[in-house]
């Protein structure tokens, strides 16, 4: 049974000014530090949904990812914050947000480091499956921690939900952005990665994952669907994409040349 713990933020430590989403380092009531992703930032709850779904798929594929937790942000939190931009972000993020366990001492992955071809292939497969456009040489979104490769930041995935139409067509796209993937040159075992993914992913897994999405992350002003209908579209997207994985696997192979 898939599950996430829920913690409450006790202390805002500092902003992590990466991209436009202004994540932050914060301490929670379990005394651990988390990289906090805010519902009031950038693409809002859709980014959190991408992070949640992508993170759980990452876990199930057996890849290393910091623990994901739901994070409560109290209405009074951040009132003493001097930076107005950050204060506005905290105010607009009252309620349930998402956090990733902070890997203290980790370093950004250097593309020159040799890694196992199957591991590289699984990560490329993951990103092609969830349509994550943001694991490039410019921004690897990979960390080395305790001599192991960790996957972070899946918030730029499932980008079909920004237009929210023709999800069936979107689920069968070849994902041309794979050509920019930082690990593509090392991904020499894409067929094996595809086989592995089909062994561990299935409808039951997808149903459990979409059921993790909090109800209030599905109250969209720009969609006519109910929260349950939105959940169902995410489920159908993943189900269809897995059934047609050869489309994006072939695209990745062709991009490798």
Predicted regions and their residues:
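Phosphate/dinucleotide-binding and metal-coordinating scaffold of catalytic cores
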Residues: 1-257
């Amino acid at each position: 049974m898939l599950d996430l713990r829920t913690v409450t933020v006790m202390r805002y430590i500092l902003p992590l000014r990466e991209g436009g989403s202004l994540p932050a380092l914060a301490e929670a009531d379990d005394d651990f530090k988390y990289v906090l992703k805010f519902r009031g930032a950038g693409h809002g709850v859709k980014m959190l949904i991408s992070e949640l779904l992508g993170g759980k798929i990452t876990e199930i594929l057996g890849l290393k990812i910091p623990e994901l937790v739901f994070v409560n942000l109290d209405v009074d939190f951040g009132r003493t914050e001097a930076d107005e931009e950050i204060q506005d972000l905290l105010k607009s993020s009252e309620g349930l947000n998402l956090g990733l366990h902070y890997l203290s001492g980790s370093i950004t992955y250097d593309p020159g480091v040799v890694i196992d071809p199957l591991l590289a292939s699984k990560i490329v497969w993951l990103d092609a499956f969830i349509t994550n456009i943001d694991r490039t040489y410019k921004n690897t979104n990979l960390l080395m921690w305790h001599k192991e490769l960790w996957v972070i930041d899946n918030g730029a995935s499932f980008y079909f939900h920004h237009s929210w139409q023709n999800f069936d067509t979107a689920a069968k796209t070849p994902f041309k952005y794979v050509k920019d993937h930082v690990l593509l040159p090392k991904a020499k075992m894409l067929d094996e990665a595809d086989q592995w993914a089909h062994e561990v992913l299935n409808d039951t897994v997808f149903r459990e994952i979409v059921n993790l999405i909090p109800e209030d992350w599905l109250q969209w002003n720009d969609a006519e669907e109910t929260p349950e209908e939105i959940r169902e579209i995410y489920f159908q997207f993943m189900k269809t994409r897995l059934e047609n994985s050869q489309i994006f696997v072939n695209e990745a192979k062709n991009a490798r040349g």
